[in-house]
Amino acid sequence: MTIKHPLVTEKAMNDMDFENKLQFVCHPEATKGDIAAAVESQFDVEVDSINTQVRMDGDKKAIVELSADDDAQEVASRIGVF
């Protein structure tokens, strides 16, 4: 299981609203390619880019930028962020 859950913070909400990005907490050994494939297959979107950070608790945070054709707010509402 590559993606554990969406990350819902104030910064994540700003990224979603203004930059068309979603944030997820992922398995620490997941690669950017693994994360992109999981996001594209689970949420039926196209990924433009991914930035990752390893958090202090050992999990990996992935910041996923969606293509211009996909709306991050619509995807977030489908997966239950709101």
From Swiss-Prot:
Which molecular-function annotations from GO does this UniProt entry contain? rRNA binding; structural constituent of ribosome
One biological-process term from Gene Ontology? Answer: translation
**Pfam family, any one:** Ribosomal_L23
- Tell me a GO cellular component: ribosome
Going by the entry's taxonomy, the superkingdom of the source organism is recorded as Archaea
Family to which the UniProt record says this protein belongs: Belongs to the universal ribosomal protein uL23 family.
Its assembly, as annotated, is:
Part of the 50S ribosomal subunit. Contacts protein L29.
Q: What does this protein do?
A: Binds to 23S rRNA. One of the proteins that surrounds the polypeptide exit tunnel on the outside of the ribosome.
This protein is called Large ribosomal subunit protein uL23
Q: What organism does this protein naturally occur in?
A: Natronomonas pharaonis (strain ATCC 35678 / DSM 2160 / CIP 103997 / JCM 8858 / NBRC 14720 / NCIMB 2260 / Gabara)
User: Taxonomy-wise, where does this protein's organism fall, top ranks first?
Assistant: Archaea, Methanobacteriati, Methanobacteriota, Stenosarchaea group, Halobacteria
The gene coding this protein: rpl23
